[in-house]
Design a protein with these regions (language model features):
Chain B
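Short cysteine/histidine-rich zinc-coordinating motifs and their immediately flanking basic loops
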Residues: 84-91, 186-192
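Short coil/turn and helix-start
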Residues: 67-68, 168, 229
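Non-catalytic, surface-exposed connector residues within folded enzymatic/regulatory domains
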Residues: 70, 122-125, 171, 232
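Post-cleavage N-terminal segment of exported redox proteins
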Residues: 2-54, 82, 92-157, 183, ...
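Conserved short C-terminal alpha-helix that flanks the catalytic cleft of nucleotide-sugar-dependent
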Residues: 62, 162-163
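An amphipathic alpha-helical core segment
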Residues: 175-209
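N-terminal, post-signal-peptide region of Sec/Tat-exported proteins
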Residues: 46-79
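The canonical Cys-X-X-Cys-His
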Residues: 70-80, 131, 159, 170-181, ...
Length: 147, 258, 106
């Protein structure tokens, strides 16, 4: 079999299903506004850890951590994660306190497509901090009958 | 005591370098090696590997009485940690009194119908996958060791023939992807060598655990061939061939795959 | 039967920070996927995961359909005193699962 026929043949397998409902960058901005209100958001202190290339969007490991002493006087109160292309912009919202000792949360998320992910942290002084990541989601090969 | 520790330390170093030398000699790659670091970590950590939820479920089923014989797996087989060790590494095999080989789920269902006098568990059902995962997990870390049963040869040869035959609208064989083009990219995905080292696997695409049969069916659909019926003997023949091709590779069940 | 895997240390030094990891079997059906007959499969997700230490809430997470099937969550806690960490998942269709682990603080 020659290389071209192989590529032509296999490329046809990867048909992208088009989603109907979808969040948008605007919907994400709106969801973020609901959390932060009119406060300024500083792009600092937050680390968003995702694999550089995502092998399957159904289960994407993600860790959000925030630099903070996590004392009663100075700690992270909340961590929120948003996305711009899933059907809904919210991924999760977690509440923390000095009882956590470290402001870091790990979980696994679904990503319908390559897109931007934003994490926002609220500290006990009422300020907001953020980090964002652009992720590339590759499609799995050889799926089953569409269900 | 210190000398003993030193000795053990040396032994570990030698074992590790011996293993590294083996890897150097053996060019075969498990699908694990084609995954990114995040997924490898997910597979290796038992409290992060979602397949372990099924292993836990399987350990509960193992002890549960079933059927009119009112027997559990444990009533006959005792502690799976000893009785099932190495079993997954040598399947498919021909059961006593039978003429055709069965895979691990086939064997579990034979136990259900013949010994427990219970109904068969449906293919890809959670209970069957959980039991399969629990049994396979007992062989984790062991090399794949197909039995030296000459009656298997004909079935294995048929599996090899299926592996090499072109089929489907795309006119591809298993071998074209997984031998000739393994390691290259299919869209963004690295084509693996197709060694059945991790079954049943937690495939992220499925968002659940699944059997080798389900994976083979996905391949067939991928090349637009008609998949064999759900419990067709072709799957067992292919598995016999693939397990022989992966002989000596280490079992990782339950594997995580994209 | 609840099918949960929890990873937390059995013992911890007083004041140290420990990591707690929890994995639970759940489909996290988004409510956006069509089923075999083209009809949308109804949403069935875990909406909330909370953790308590001797009854006091130490962690609370609101989940969305974007959390992957068989949800995994890891977080940290200060080992303040010996006791029980209670984990609770609640969601659609009356889903409630509770799990406890005991941590001895020295």
């Amino acid at each position: 079999m020659d290389r071209r026929r192989f590529l032509v043949g296999t490329a046809a397998i990867v048909v992208v299903p088009l989603g109907s409902a979808s969040a948008t960058p605007e919907a994400m901005a709106e969801a973020i506004r609901k959390v932060v209100g009119d406060s300024a958001v500083t792009e600092s202190r937050v680390t968003l850890d995702l694999p550089p290339l995502i092998e399957n969007g159904n289960t994407v490991p993600l860790v959000v951590s925030v630099e903070s002493p996590m004392t009663v006087a100075d700690h992270v109160k909340a961590i929120h994660v948003f996305n711009e292309k899933n059907p809904q912009p919210n991924v999760f919202s977690a509440r923390l306190s000095a009882r956590n000792g470290r402001a870091a949360i790990g979980t696994r998320i679904k990503l319908g497509d390559s897109q931007k992910i934003v994490a926002i942290a609220e500290t006990s002084d009422g300020r907001f901090w953020s980090a964002s990541a652009d992720v590339i989601v590759t499609l799995a090969a050889c799926l089953e009958e569409s269900t | 005591m210190r000398a003993l520790h030193f000795g053990i330390g040396l032994a570990i170093i030698f074992a590790a370098s011996w293993a590294a030398a083996q890897v150097g000699a053996d060019k075969r790659r498990s699908g694990t090696q084609d995954m990114g670091e995040a997924l490898q970590k997910m597979q290796d950590d038992d409290t992060a590997n979602p397949g372990m939820l099924f292993v836990q479920l399987g350990s509960q089923s193992w002890a549960k009485k079933a059927g009119t014989a009112d027997k559990s797996c444990a009533d006959c087989h005792g502690n799976a940690g000893t009785s099932m060790k190495g079993v997954a590494a040598r399947y498919p095999a021909i059961p006593k009194g039978a003429e055709a080989p069965v895979d691990l789920d086939g064997r579990i269902n034979l136990c259900r119908t013949e010994n427990q006098k219970a109904e068969r568990l449906p293919p890809e059902s959670r209970e069957l996958l959980a039991l399969e995962a629990y049994v396979a997990h007992q062989s984790r870390g062991l090399p794949i060791a197909p039995p030296a049963d000459p009656r298997l040869d004909a079935f294995r040869d048929q599996g090899a023939a299926i592996y090499r035959a072109r089929q489907g609208q795309l006119n591809l064989s298993c071998a074209i992807c997984h031998d000739d083009n393994a390691g290259r990219k299919l869209a963004g995905v690295t084509i693996p060598e197709a060694h059945p080292t991790g079954y049943p696997i937690y495939r992220l695409e499925w968002q659940t655990l699944g059997s080798l049969k389900r994976r083979l069916r996905n391949c067939l659909v991928g090349i637009r061939a008609e998949p064999y019926a759900s419990e067709a003997p072709e799957y067992v023949m292919l598995e016999l061939f693939l397990m022989d091709r992966a002989k000596g590779m280490v079992l990782e069940a339950p594997g995580v795959r994209p | 039967m609840a099918n949960v895997l929890v990873n937390a240390p059995k013992t911890a030094k007083r004041g140290s920070v420990v990591e707690i990891k929890a994995l639970i079997m759940h489909p996290m059906e988004t409510g956006f996927r069509p089923g075999t007959m083209g009809k949308i499969i109804p949403r069935n997700i875990i909406e909330r995961f909370t953790a308590t230490w001797n009854g006091t809430e130490i962690f609370d997470m609101e989940m969305s359909p974007a959390i992957a099937a068989n949800p995994f969550v890891s977080f940290f806690a200060v080992a303040s005193e010996s006791g029980t960490v209670g984990l609770r998942w609640t969601g659609d269709e009356g889903f409630v699962v509770e799990e406890r682990v005991v941590i001895a603080v020295e």
